[in-house]
Structure formats: structure tokens, C-alpha cells
Amino acid sequence: MSSSLLAGGHMVSLTPCEESRMALHPTPSPGLPALCPYYTTESWGTQPLMAPTLRKGSSDRLQQAQQAEARAHCLLQGPGEQASGASQDLESCIDFSLEALNQMILEIDPTFQLLPSGTAGPQAESTNSIMSRNKKEEPEALDIKYIEVTSTRSRYLDGPQRCSSPCATPPFGSPRSGSLFLSRDIPRETRSSSNESLIFSGNQGRGPSPLTPSSLSNAIPCRESRTSGSPLATPPGWEKGLRAPQRGSRVSILSASPVSDVSYVFGSNQSLPHSSLSSYPSSSRSLGSPASSSSSLHSLDRGSQCGRPSDAQAPSNPILGMGQPQAVQSTPVAKEQASSCPASVTNSMADIPIVLINGSPEPQSPPAQRTPGHQDSVQSRVTSPSHLCQAIKSPSKTLPDVPLPASPDGPAKDMQPTMKFVMDTSKYWFKPSITREQAINLLRTEKPGAFVIRDSSSYRGSFGLALKVQETSASAPNRPGEDSSDLIRHFLIESSAKGVHLKGADEEPYFGSLSSFVCQHSIMALALPCKLTIPQKELGGAEPASDSPTHGQTSCLKISAGCHTLYLSSVSVETLSGALAVQKAISVTLERDVLPTPTVVHFKVTEQGITLTDVQRKVFFRRHYPLSALRFCGMDPEQRKWQKYCKPSRIFGFVAKSQTEPQENVCHLFAEYDAVQPASQVISLVTALLQDTERM
């Protein structure tokens, strides 16, 4: 039959024959009858047929076909219809049945093959057996190539080539109102989703079929496997008819590449748990055959559905269609559903395993496992979640700064700290304003692993780490002035654009913050002598309060303070002291033609005096002023400000004896460098120390 008839998708109605509208020339062959019924898009009619000379036996076969059609028509009619039909002319009111039409098409095209259907009823089975028996008895076929059907006439023609045979498939039971789907067996790439089938419908009074699909683009109900022997076995040509409409859908199940079926199955095996994959043992069939997609159809529950109607597509593989949870499935299976669509199809991140997003698999869901047949191939494509978990847990220099949370199965034996715990306890281990001596005093009575981090007084922007180590680890030479019995080690944590890094340890990675540094070293020691123990309370313990004046003086002397300031200049004030000396020194400095260039220094106050450390080593390295040489320390009485980076900064200074001229005093001027570290703290401490010295 012509491709235009099969691919057009026209609805041809079987109506009683009418008078011929156009007559053809009589056939020259005496073997053919004068009148032969044919069909057009308008109606059935009996027209003189123009055909080439047939082989011997052709007229007998045509007569037998007409007799068989008449017998089949009489069988399908009821008793009342047979009585009424006997009084009418057979040629004027022929009501062809579905089986008679199939037999007529078979007589016209011997290569036409009827597809087996177990749900067509006993009449269809008997008709199929009769037609197959007649086909065996008639080995010789008519030399008719195809039929050209137009709106006005129909004739037999000799075509240049033989067309493919159409396949008649009653889908899922008896067709509604005698309708018949004729699916053209042509390549899928050359077909259109809207022009794939021709439906012949008659006016027989047959009951509607509840399983007849309304459209090929809708979701197709699940079918049993072909090997199960079920009456709903999928015909060979039906799968091709199902695949073509999917190519025009919004989201295509299979891409156009030859290996798309393989990659899609691998994506499903990666995301689905092992319990779901075990119910589909045949998913690892031969993927090299052309029918690899159709061979992977598996048997599902009768109450489940293969696809969702809203998707407007019918997945050809149940595993591929299980990307979304479905309401008709059981609850455990619905919980185990995961996105199985590969990123190459959906261009999204749906196929990324959950372990890559949350850091660990979902609780109450086993990690995805691969089938033995796909193990080697999948390993080359993507790493399994179990391997990812092992890679995350193993220490490496390429690990992220923030360690991932522990497994939801339960906490580890050593209770590895988390980032939240480290940040919540930072008030105990981060003391930016304390000095080196204070850090030693805090850790003196603590256990090995206790630590404290402070701002470095020698390197701007860096941090000092004081760590209490074990006795076996205290083999390194001690620095000058350091007591070996204290077992306190000091390390410098450098800060740069890459992050924070332990100075002198090339094997140490860079961390994004101090919290990440502490959290990682509390899990692994790395370059440190021992692991860090995160404190959960104040280090050194709280000392009991006392009203004793001696104890008050001692505690006051032990207190020290420090901050970063801008060193402006040093001005000789002769014999002046107090606030007047600071006021005069500031006035002299601001009246200069060229203002001094400030430098950042660390201003530290202890019971021994004031120690200045040039952070940038521009003006001096370190200066120390004993407490006995100090005279005064305070702010500018006139509240003048120093313009620092377009922001005003308060000016203060202290007065001390000159180291070169014992009779003169020198005022050293400073400006606040950071609002977080105000100068009021060091000024108050110096004033308190001077008052205590005068009392003594």
C-alpha cells in the first residue's frame, strides 16, 4: 500500500456501498469480474476495475475472497439482522467486518502479516487461523505492487519498488467500534509522531474496549514481559510505534545518539538503590543489539504505571521512567526513588548523587550499588557514593577547609568536633589581646593538647599559637628565657590571600579561617606535635574572689593589655609632665610643615613597663620603657584627631624619662589604629600601675 495512505492518518469509514461515481474502462481480462468493490476516503463502491493481466488462478482467488467476505458478514450479524439483511440486495448494503477487511488486504498484498493478539477474542483467533491456512494453501501471490487511492478512483499499478508491509495491530484488546490501527513499519527517524497510523472504523455494534489508548502520546499502561506468556505480550511492531512520539515530547527519554540507551541505564543504576535494581535483573541485557531499548522492558506490578500522564510521553524502559515518585507505588519504593535522568539529557544537576550535595548518603537509604555486569563500565564513568564517602573521610591536602559532618549512622568513637562546636567555643581558645606570658600562664596547668590563639605582636595580621605538649614531645630546644618544665610550644600562623597556614610546615594545607584550622587539627595533628583539644570552659580556671588588699594588688600587677597603634613621633618636653606635656607634644607635631609618617606598632603594657614593637620594622625593632621611667599616660586634652585613611583617630601619648638626658622628659605620641582595640584599655592600665608604684 502507498505510504501516503498509511502515513496520512485518515479515518476511512466503512459505509454501505453507493452508486459508482466514476467508471473506469472495462478490464480486458475475462477472468476478472466486471465489478469489484474498492475503498476510498469517501465511501465504498463497486467500480469497473482497471488492472493488468493476472496470472492463472487469480480469478478463483478473488471469487473465494468475495465468498469469504459474505460468509463472515453473515456470521457477525445477529438473528434479527440476518433476517432483515436477506431481503436487501447484498451488493447495495455490504457491511464489511474487521476480519473481512483484514482478509481482503491479505488477498491484495500477500506479504501483509497480521500481528498476533491474545485479547482480540475467539473470533479474531479463528479468523487469523483461517487466513493463515488460506495463505499456506495459496503459495502463489498476486503480482500487485501497491494500491494508489485517491478521492475519485482507485486502480492497481506496478510500482518501481516493493513497499514494506504494514502491520495491523489491535492494541490491548478488541478495538473500539471495529477500529484498526495500521502502523507503518518504516524507520523511526523518517516518521512523524502525528502521521503514523491509519484507523479504519466501521459501524458495527461492538462494545467499546476499556483498554484502548486515546492517543499514542499519552502514558501507556504497563505491559507484562514478552517472556512471561501473558496475553498482553507486546507485539514486535508496537514498540516502534511507541518510541516515535517520544521524540517530539518536551523532555525526550532517549537521546538521538547511538549510546544514549547505555548511558541512561548507567545513570539509573547509579541513582537507584540496590533493592530497586534487584527487581529488574534483565536490565543488563545485550546493549549492542539494535533492539537494546526494547529488550529492557521489564515486568512491573499490575497496579503500577510506567509513566505519568502529565509528562505526555511513554517511557520504553520502566527503569528510565521511575525518575519521579508515583502515588500508586508502595511507600518504601517511593522513598527510594532518586533522579535517574543523566545530565546529558536534561542538562541539569538532577543526576548528581546525594552524597555530593549533603556530604553523606541519606539516612535510612543504602548507598547505590552496581550490577556485576556494569561494574567495570560504571567505574570509568562515575564514582560510586560509597567510594566518595571513603574519599571524603580519608585525609588529604586537597580536602576542603571545613571538614564534612560525621555520618548519620552515629557519632564517631572519639567524638570528632564539628565546625559549629569549634565556632561556639572560640571565646575560650581565641584571646587576641593577651600576651605571650599570659598564654603560658593559662596553659601551665592544662593537659597536653590545650591551646590558645592570640594576635602576633611581631607580625602584623598573623596569629600566635601556644600549645601544651606532652613530655615525650618536648625534645625541641627551648627558646631563650623559656622554662623547659612548662612544655609550652609557640607557633606562628601566617595569614595571606590563600588563607591561614602554619609557618614552616610545607606539608600543611591552607585553611580559609582559624576555625577551619582548629577543627582540622583537632582531628589530625598534621605538623603539630599533638592534636588540639578544644576547650569547653575558660582556661586556667577561675580564681576565687578576695577582699584582701595584697591579693588585689597582686592580681592587678598580673594583668596586662596590648593593642596595635600608630606611632607618630617622640617630642622632648623638657621638664614638663602630665597632660600639659602631651598637649605640648601634639601641638608641636601638628605645627610641622611635613607631618610625620606613622607606622604600626604593638603597644603592650605589663607590670614591667611598656614595650613597643614595630610590626613593619620601619622605624625601630623593639623598645622597652620600664615602669620606673614612666611619668604619665593619657589622651589629648584638646581632643584633637589624627586623619588616618580619611578617618579621624584619637591621639594619646605617655611621658617617660629621656634615655640620653636624665633631666628631660620625652613624650611619645600615638593614634588609635583599630576601633576594635581602643587605647583606653592600655591608658587605664598604665595609670593604675603608676598609682600602685607611688603607694609602694
From Swiss-Prot:
Keyword set, alphabetical order: Actin-binding, Cell junction, Cytoplasm, Cytoskeleton, Phosphoprotein, SH2 domain, Signal
Q: Provide the species name.
A: Mus musculus
* Annotated Gene3D superfamilies: Pleckstrin-homology domain (PH domain)/Phosphotyrosine-binding domain (PTB) (2.30.29.30), SH2 domain (3.30.505.10)
Q: Which gene encodes it?
A: Tns4
Q: Which GO terms describe its cellular component?
A: cytoskeleton; cytosol; focal adhesion
Q: What is this protein called?
A: Tensin-4
Functional summary from the UniProt entry: Promotes EGF-induced cell migration by displacing tensin TNS3 from the cytoplasmic tail of integrin ITGB1 which results in dissociation of TNS3 from focal adhesions, disassembly of actin stress fibers and initiation of cell migration. Suppresses ligand-induced degradation of EGFR by reducing EGFR ubiquitination in the presence of EGF. Increases MET protein stability by inhibiting MET endocytosis and subsequent lysosomal degradation which leads to increased cell survival, proliferation and migration.
Q: Where is the composition biased (Polar residues)?
A: 192-203, 326-344, 372-397
Q: What SUPFAM superfamilies does UniProt report for this protein, alphabetically?
A: PH domain-like, SH2 domain
